[in-house]
Amino acid sequence: MRIWVLENKTAAEAAEKIMLLKTRLKSFNFNFGDIAPILLTDNGGEFSNATAFENDESGNLETHLFYCEPNSPYEKPDIEKNHTLFRDIVPKGSSFDDFSQEKVDLIFSHVNAVKRKQFNGKSAYDVFTFYYSEILANVLGISFIPPENVIQSPRLLKTIK
């Protein structure tokens, strides 16, 4: 899972971030639609420009964006598991005001490093890099965290400057 920090939480800002990602992926010969043929999101205003997410810069459809119903975690259980793991590190009620992209990347690198029953004892990072590559994980800002170094508690935040 990859999360981007949005300063203003607007559709324009989200569209800009997704276009920057698509451009960056292309510069490494990766196609966004091959990596993410389906996008699941909530109904937040920052996701209201579906065309920016679904189409490439030429207007060609490359992925499909689906909006999940409010209060329906069963529609995106894997995302909800990541949310639970995130909350192990950043408890509900915590402020995100000082969260830089680097801080979020480190938090989700730890989330992605947790071994999971659903992956037969592998981590999301292990599964992702098996199918795609460590290069792509690095392009996305996802770092490998050795199992013995995973910190799945608020203590991780104290290690981040």
PLM feature segments, named:
Residues M1-W4, Y67, K92:
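Short small-residue beta-strand/loop micro-motif enriched in glycine and branched aliphatics
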Residues I3-F30:
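Active-site beta-loop-alpha junctions of metal-dependent nucleic acid enzymes
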Residues F30-I35, N60:
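Short helix-terminating capping/connector loops at secondary-structure junctions
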Residues K92-K161:
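C-terminal domain-tail junction helix/linker
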Residues K9, L20-L21, N55-E62:
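Active/binding-pocket-proximal capping segment
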Residues E13, F47-A50:
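Extracytoplasmic/secreted cell-surface and envelope-processing proteins
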Residues I38:
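Hydrophobic "anchor" residues on beta-strands that sit immediately upstream
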